[in-house]
């Protein structure tokens, strides 16, 4: 079973590899080469009026056919395929993840006799239901036709629960471009209130550097006392926030940013997180200090957020997806 899937977000693409390869027994390929853009199939970034994202994601280089490895998951091969090569293969599914690619990928699916799948992981992502996709929704977006709401899977061995005794007095963030967000000002204001803690700000543009591999991220999370995850616009699915929960480290941030979103259940003030909206910044800092000093209380919070994560049943969701793909799940 061959599956064609665009790749614009490494966590989402990896989750689709786990689904279509590990669970469903197929092989996932991703487009490579500018021909995909020239032929009108790949349109991600066309709103910029040029092909900058096509050159970033499609140009030959790191994703040569059959030999590339994901820099974030270096053990996982990425099978790149040119347009000419793709036209010569049989396809079961053609999967678009970028909003701009849905029309072109639907066209390619029709041409090769494949089923068209749309995997949605971003907030407020537009779905053209007139294309009649089989929709895998891992955000708050409404489902109006054939689709299921699921959580994006990630490697449970890498992000397995880690004993709270491994944690050190470090508060870390892995939010990309955090410095440009309004919530970052609160984080900076909190730093002098907690001199006994070290703060690590990672991710793209992070002052402490971007961490490339997920294994390194998991190791740093395990050695952290808390995950600082405060994003005014929340997340579609939210790989980082679910990684924190899987490893078992309490969150710091605003619950209100996640109301109605996939990660809402991870925000329970005093149980799984410190909700900055419920008290002053000074009182929040004092609460963080008190929780860290009270090891049984801290352990209980680590266990509580892990227990909340364990409510996700990836096996059951995979069977829902299988039913959707095979046609036994009716439209919403």
Task: Pin down the residues of each PLM region.
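Conserved catalytic-core segment of nucleotide-activated headgroup transferases in glycan assembly
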Residues: 152-217, 240
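Acidic donor-binding loop of glycosyltransferase active sites
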Residues: 219-236, 249
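Structural motif
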Residues: 5-9, 33, 95-101, 119-123, ...
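N-terminal pre-catalytic "stem/leader" segment of glycosyltransferase-like enzymes
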Residues: 1-107, 111-112, 276, 314-332
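A charged, aromatic-enriched C-terminal amphipathic alpha-helix characteristic of glycosyltransferases
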Residues: 279-282, 292-329
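Donor nucleotide-sugar binding/catalytic pocket of nucleotide-sugar-dependent glycosyltransferases
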Residues: 117-162
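Nucleotide-sugar-dependent
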Residues: 229-242, 253-265
């Amino acid at each position: 079973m061959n599956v064609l899937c665009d790749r614009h977000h490494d966590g989402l693409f990896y989750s689709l590899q786990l689904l279509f390869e590990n669970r469903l027994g197929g092989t996932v390929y991703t487009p490579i080469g500018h021909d995909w853009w020239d032929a009108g199939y790949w349109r991600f970034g066309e709103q910029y009026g040029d092909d900058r994202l096509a050159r970033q994601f499609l140009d030959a280089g790191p994703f040569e056919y059959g030999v590339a490895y994901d820099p974030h998951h270096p053990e996982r091969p990425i099978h790149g395929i040119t347009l000419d090569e793709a036209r010569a293969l049989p396809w079961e599914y053609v999967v678009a993840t970028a909003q701009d690619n849905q029309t072109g990928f639907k066209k390619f699916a029709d041409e090769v006799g494949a089923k068209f799948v749309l995997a949605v992981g971003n907030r407020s992502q537009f779905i053209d239901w007139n294309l009649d996709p089989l929709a895998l929704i891992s955000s708050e977006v409404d489902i109006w036709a054939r689709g299921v709401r699921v959580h994006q899977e990630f490697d449970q061995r890498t992000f397995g629960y880690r004993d709270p005794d491994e944690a050190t007095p470090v508060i870390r963030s892995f939010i990309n471009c955090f410095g440009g967000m309004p919530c970052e000002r609160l984080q900076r204001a909190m730093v002098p209130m907690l001199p006994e803690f070290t703060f690590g700000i990672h991710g793209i543009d992070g002052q402490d550097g971007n961490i490339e591999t997920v294994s390194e991220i998991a190791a740093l999370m395990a050695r952290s006392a808390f995950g600082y995850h405060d994003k005014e616009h929340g997340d579609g699915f939210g790989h980082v926030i679910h990684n924190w929960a899987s490893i078992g480290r309490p969150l710091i941030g605003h619950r209100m940013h996640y109301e109605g979103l996939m990660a809402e259940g991870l925000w329970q003030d005093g149980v799984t997180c410190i909700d900055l909206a419920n008290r002053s910044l000074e009182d929040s800092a004092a609460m963080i200090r008190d929780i860290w000093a009270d090891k049984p209380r801290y352990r209980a919070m680590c266990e509580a957020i892990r227990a909340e994560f364990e409510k996700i049943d990836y096996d059951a969701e995979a069977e829902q997806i299988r039913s959707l793909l095979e046609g036994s799940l009716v439209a919403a």
